[in-house]
């Protein structure tokens, strides 16, 4: 977990988990579920393998996390589609990228229903309950798979009220969609986004 991004005090609230510098000690049988950024970590390991083999180009996908590696034979950018969060059988937009890691988080594929309400599989660490957010989809593009995987989840939980800090972050590009179909994005990627459904629109 890239604790430098948020600070360990925001992530660790269990007395059985001790953090000192870069060392983490788990006590009394405590385990950590790496589901939040396991795919991103795996992508980074695949990238190391591709580097060692001097691969020219590859697209590796672990579901919601994808590695765009190298340069395509025709020298054009990669084109990435984002699932429509209101209709999973379709896409809502696409964008082009020269390469890197892409991760998307949302509550539209894995959720449960209780008390007449849909609850996301993504939990808010400050409450211990499924997160309640006005965002329905968050995509992050960057160079590190573990960071894009982790950050897409964090930004999704934080909602649109915390978007500005991420939209202005020069190390990543962000595309976020709220429950009304409004698309927020980093300035650097807006010209490379193509919206494919008229129920979505830029802020």
Could you tell me what each predicted segment is?
Residues 14, 55, 75-77, 90-92, ...:
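Extracytoplasmic
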Residues 1-7, 11-12:
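Single conserved hydrophobic/aromatic residue that forms the stacking wall/gate
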Residues 64, 119-175:
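Proteins synthesized as precursors that undergo proteolytic processing into mature forms
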Residues 19-86:
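RNase III-family endoribonuclease catalytic core
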Residues 179-203:
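Low-complexity, Gly/Ser/Thr/Pro-rich intrinsically disordered linker/tail segments
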Residues 71-108:
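Phosphate/pyrophosphate-binding betaalpha-module
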Residues 86, 107-121, 126:
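Pocket-lining segment of extracytoplasmic ligand-binding domains
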